Amino acid sequence: MLRNTFFRNTSRRFLATVKQPSIGRYTGKPNPSTGKYTVSFIEGDGIGPEISKSVKKIFSAANVPIEWESCDVSPIFVNGLTTIPDPAVQSITKNLVALKGPLATPIGKGHRSLNLTLRKTFGLFANVRPAKSIEGFKTTYENVDLVLIRENTEGEYSGIEHIVCPGVVQSIKLITRDASERVIRYAFEYARAIGRPRVIVVHKSTIQRLADGLFVNVAKELSKEYPDLTLETELIDNSVLKVVTNPSAYTDAVSVCPNLYGDILSDLNSGLSAGSLGLTPSANIGHKISIFEAVHGSAPDIAGQDKANPTALLLSSVMMLNHMGLTNHADQIQNAVLSTIASGPENRTGDLAGTATTSSFTEAVIKRL
């Protein structure tokens, strides 16, 4: 009885999108001969192959109708810039969806973030970061339930910077109406889909009057198309103060913000909800293509030691399954993962003050499917 109650309470916990937002919907079809969907899998670097193996084992045990297509995004140089290899681009473009482990950006002149390169290549304009407390895993804050949507393609991450003269560097924050409208409209649609009545635009237009001012003004214009939702605006510094003092004030809202603010706030939210990025899923949404990823790093210091926590990638795969409409399989895996974590330190990895290995955690999840 207790187990069933836990399952009901955690159902569709991280990405409640049984009703899909009207933007960025998955349109892929299963293979007629196998009845399975093909998903590109970027295993990543460092601990990536280990946590990817965990996902594959659990999906196999759960009989999820998915065939994995391995995808190598090791960067190549074209005209001096980091580029994704053509086979990887073709795979993801064909399959419309990918699951991605952590990537390490090579060190050296000309290399830019591989995550940024993927977002640019596939037009992944919205980064969806849910953060919610896990029942049975005690952290400083309880009952955290936050959803943040980050603009994913421009802002301070546009890569436009140069040396003006020795000792002076200029970095450009690029904000455009098109990109702002894209992500804000998605935030409205997402809020409507998951039943949250408020959309909060986080900004600093008191200082960045033109850049953030444009972002806020676009939101105000779009809000007229969503009379059933309430638009609020909030200064970034005030938002940080409020969320750490009273995160429950945001349980009925979806926050949306420009790129840099979203990068910082999303990790803050993860700290409030779980105390670890090892539990945090993420979705990168484009109009046609979406990539789901663990947001933590590649952790080369523990790679190959059977110590890595696969939870973030597993919960990202749950987000992916919901996105694809495979909600029963999503619920099955999600509930198994969360009940495993709640069962005690013997089934938690070291980053959660537990004693489990990657392998033993994986087997514990499979037993709970």
From Swiss-Prot:
Subcellular location(s) per record: Mitochondrion matrix
Regulation: Allosterically regulated by several compounds including AMP, NAD(+), and citrate.
FT transit peptide: 1-15
Keyword line: Allosteric enzyme, Magnesium, Manganese, Metal-binding, Mitochondrion, NAD, Oxidoreductase, Phosphoprotein, RNA-binding, Transit peptide, Tricarboxylic acid cycle
Binding residue positions for Mg(2+): D237, D263, D267
Any GO MF annotation of the entry: isocitrate dehydrogenase (NAD+) activity
Cofactor: Mg(2+); Mn(2+)
Gene3D superfamilies: Isopropylmalate Dehydrogenase
Record site: Critical for catalysis: Y157, K204
Listed PANTHER family: DECARBOXYLATING DEHYDROGENASES-ISOCITRATE, ISOPROPYLMALATE, TARTRATE, ISOCITRATE DEHYDROGENASE [NAD] SUBUNIT ALPHA, MITOCHONDRIAL
The family this protein is said to belong to: Belongs to the isocitrate and isopropylmalate dehydrogenases family.
Extra information: Present with 43100 molecules/cell in log phase SD medium.
Protein name (Swiss-Prot/TrEMBL): Isocitrate dehydrogenase [NAD] subunit 2, mitochondrial
